[in-house]
């Protein structure tokens, strides 16, 4: 177990921020994260966080995953103090971080997210992981299922995916998995693209609209200018930014501000 003291890090806020569907609270101040084929249990008491994982995994995977090298107080300090709404949102969600998650997992997760609530999204992802992922055992003895590879999903049938409660989204997942396997879309190339270029490429995938493309850019490519607009965000923009969100002021971190707003609207 590794014990780290840090600021602007709150497991509860991250878990409820809508960006990660395989993070769950499993006890008082205790959380579990499955990312790709990795497993982690964490506890937090104020600013003290305990990571139950090998030190090697923490250094080479979880530091990047939780964006621990970034000082999020700088984002909070960027908020215009005259913007009372965003100031309140930043204060409420000051422990949120933009997780650096696996691109493939984010593409499939946000395809599944369409017209879905968080509970159902999590269940769908758990279903496909159990059906098509590899069963594994963590260093602490916990059994879990890795997120399925593109190859595993490409070999599935639409009916099998529908049996995982994906509904009409099954055809989106199957089409995307096969495009990745056949080389019609390169995940590595997406990592090298600008936000605008990556967004345009993602919009070419079957079933991907603007919100889903922006979610993938923000949470799968860590492109912090992406600003996904769902119902919660649209309502906030209409109520508090009738002249439009101040994009120029927050250039380079619009996605961080989006998360503060999303969490604030969700928790009000």
Protein language model regions, located:
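HhH-family (HhH-GPD) DNA N-glycosylase catalytic core used in base-excision repair
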Residues: 1-268
